[in-house]
Amino acid sequence: MLDVCLLGTAGMMPLPNRWLTALSLKYNGSNILIDCGEGTQIAMKEAGINFKPIDILCITHFHADHISGLPGLLLTMGNAERTEPLTIIGPKGLTRVVTALRTIAPELPFEIKCIELNEQDEYFEMNGYHIHAFRVKHAVLCYGYSVEIKRSGRFSVERANEKEIPMRLWNPLQKGNTVEFEGRVYTPDMVLGPARKGIKVTYCTDSRPLEHIVEAAEGSDLFICEGMYAEKEKIVKAKQYKHMTFYEAADMAKRAGVKELWLTHFSPSLVRADDYMPQVRDIFANAYLGKDAKSVELMFDED
């Protein structure tokens, strides 16, 4: 099970009932935070999300509405006597930016490990998460993120017995570990069937539409994508400032074959956003407006 909570849905500036951009993903006692805009701490408190289990922070880019909440969050983590290291992933220049933001939090009781992104696509495996960072098209260097929880095949007791594998080795093999025991090497494929469908969430904000985004989001259970503008005539502004309209996001969701789309990162000028959703659903039926604290528990398919 993967817990998803959209903490903030505002672009550019926070508004009443609309904090700046942030997304929380929780799995197996670990927490990923994607972006950390102003108000993220309040949004986390309101959603009942603990600061301590945050192991990984993914930053899309260095515009203030995506990172302005970071110094305060680091201070809160330090005041909570956190000692476990924090990994921060972000575009090239991340170390410099984090160092600058830490001016007000120079001494922390935990290590910060910065991973700078340089390539078009980069992949990481941490704490059970498979993270794909993919470059998008904004005014500055910017990345989207797909986070996947993979699922191994079913364990076959029959195959384990046929191969005379000691029962004490079944558990580590079922978890995907290779085991050496009494001079023999046992591998997971000896007892596991084909990999089963996992859970996938893709998050993309601050970009023009790209085929690269469609490819990264393909097959996602949930696609969270910016919809900066809802008014169709604002396509000119969207192109000028490298953002998207509701309809462009819906078109990408359709082409990517995702199960569900949440729109987010709304312009401060956007009001009565619900009025535009019928037209959006004409393009992609399973599209919804993101709202602060909107959450879902994504489950593995039963098979």
Swiss-Prot record:
Pfam families: Lactamase_B, Lactamase_B_2. The keyword Metal-binding applies. NCBIfam families: PRK00055.1-3 (NF000801), RNase_Z (TIGR02651). It comes from the Bacteria. Zn(2+) 2 binds at D65, H66, D206, H265. One of its GO terms (molecular function) is zinc ion binding. It catalyses: Endonucleolytic cleavage of RNA, removing extra 3' nucleotides from tRNA precursor, generating 3' termini of tRNAs. A 3'-hydroxy group is left at the tRNA terminus and a 5'-phosphoryl group is left at the trailer molecule. Binds 2 Zn(2+) ions. This is Ribonuclease Z. The active site is at D65. Its cofactor is Zn(2+). Homodimer. Zinc phosphodiesterase, which displays some tRNA 3'-processing endonuclease activity. Probably involved in tRNA maturation, by removing a 3'-trailer from precursor tRNA. Keywords: Endonuclease, Hydrolase, Metal-binding, Nuclease, tRNA processing, Zinc. The gene is rnz. Zn(2+) 1 binds at H61, H63, H138, D206. The keyword Transferase does not apply. Belongs to the RNase Z family. SUPFAM superfamilies: Metallo-hydrolase/oxidoreductase. Its EC number is 3.1.26.11. It is an enzyme of class 3 (hydrolase). PANTHER family: ZINC PHOSPHODIESTERASE ELAC PROTEIN 1.
